[in-house]
Amino acid sequence: MTRKLVLLRHGQSQWNSMNRFTGWVDIGLTEQGHQEATMAGHLMKKEGLEFDVAHTSLLKRAIHTLQDALKALDQDWLPIYKSWRLNERHYGALQGLDKIDTAAKHGEEQVNIWRRSYDIQPPPIDLDDPSHPMRDRRYAALDRKVLPVRESLKNTLERVLPYWNDAIAPQLNDNKTVLISAHGNSLRALYKYLNKESDEKILNVNIPTGIPLLFELSDTLQVVSYRYLGDPDAAQRAAEMVANQGKAK
């Protein structure tokens, strides 16, 4: 009997629509983002998915996406677990910058490396920056040493993996059907781990907003199959749009 896991990237955020690096900045959804989240719920309902538990980050774009999707699923009552470990990758000093302007300044190749490589970090955020996570009370209980000033995808995976091992994997092993509403890079990290994707191939993996990615896992949590729900061509086009965000005009 296979276990079912759905990875759902949040719907379009306000900074997605403005093509800005977002990272740990707590930006809300656009109206389109809410619609994407609701449509994701309808797609999961059409698939006949009945979840036992849901997980999300501490950032409202992922939280609100989960709320909208569960409402469309008529599964609002599900227990929801929130963890900072599911937050987006911290983009350091790039946070808030326009991706096209940054590509024009530093070159498309450099921006693509910052965005999509596995182990290269962006420039760090300054410790005195008002947006440093140590100034955000949602992280007040955490040791400052674990709060990032920048992250590569490798760093993000190292952050996400303990939560997977301690919270999510045990639920899957208990035959629970699990929904994770999170972010492009925290989900890319899980995608890499689940699919045993190479450091090179992960460069070309782009996860679109608001389209559920359904994994079927064996009893040892090995991937049996995975696919986007809905129109596969639409999912491919949406992923290509994500890939093109870092290109200069």
UniProtKB/Swiss-Prot annotation:
PANTHER family per UniProt: PHOSPHOGLYCERATE MUTASE
Assembly notes: Homodimer.
Keyword Endoplasmic reticulum found: no
Pfam families: His_Phos_1
GO BP terms, alphabetized: gluconeogenesis; glycolytic process
Similarity comment text for this entry: Belongs to the phosphoglycerate mutase family. BPG-dependent PGAM subfamily.
Enzyme Commission designation: 5.4.2.11
Catalyzed chemical reaction(s): (2R)-2-phosphoglycerate = (2R)-3-phosphoglycerate
InterPro entries referenced in this protein's UniProt entry, alphabetically: His_Pase_superF_clade-1 (IPR013078), His_PPase_superfam (IPR029033), PG/BPGM_mutase_AS (IPR001345), Phosphogly_mut1 (IPR005952)
Protein name: 2,3-bisphosphoglycerate-dependent phosphoglycerate mutase
List of catalytic residues: 10, 88
SMART domains reported in the protein's UniProt record: PGAM
Protein keywords: Gluconeogenesis, Glycolysis, Isomerase
Pathway: Carbohydrate degradation; glycolysis; pyruvate from D-glyceraldehyde 3-phosphate: step 3/5
Keyword Isomerase among record annotations: yes
Membrane-spanning residues: none
Organism for this UniProt entry: Xylella fastidiosa (strain Temecula1 / ATCC 700964)
